[in-house]
Design a protein with these regions (language model features):
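Short, flexible helix-loop junctions that flank or precede catalytic/ligand sites
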Residues: 1-144
Length: 144
């Protein structure tokens, strides 16, 4: 798949992960340790986007999806190339103007649309403290 992407073919893949950052880690960790640096280099050059999805219990029954969207950027490429995937979550949190949506931001929005219980959303949050601060700031009227 990486070789196909290098030739400018559009490649889609699916992984069972809870966040975009975890998906990037899973992609590189799937290779032998002696190949991971090269994989990170290639991935940093070809990755255009990652979409993560979770299903949560909806108030009143059923399920509702929550999404995280990571878009390719120079900062993302550097993080992947240097193996600093722990910074990807913060890139997403600050990349809203570039079309990125953080899982925790999306979860907080579902809470405020009264679609899911705050405890259900908190359980699925990537960064529990960040999610908690979003909920508190929204309740205090500091953010919309």
């Amino acid at each position: 798949a990486l070789h196909a992407a290098e030739t400018r073919l559009l490649v889609f893949g699916t992984l069972h992960t809870n966040s975009a950052a975890t998906a990037v880690d899973r992609l590189t960790d799937g290779f032998p340790p002696d190949e991971q640096e090269q994989v990170r280099i290639v991935l940093s050059e070809v990755l255009k986007a990652v979409v993560a999805q979770l299903l949560l219990r909806k108030k009143g029954g059923g399920r509702v999806p929550a999404f995280e969207v990571l878009r390719g950027s120079a900062a993302l490429a550097n993080a992947i190339r240097e193996g600093k995937t722990a910074t990807i979550t913060s890139l997403i949190q600050t990349g809203r103007s570039h079309g990125m949506v953080g899982m925790d931001q999306y979860l907080a929005e579902l809470v405020f649309q009264d679609l899911v219980d705050v405890d259900e959303a908190a359980d699925k949050a990537v960064d529990k403290e960040y999610f908690k601060s979003l909920v508190e700031k929204r309740r205090a009227g500091e953010i919309k």
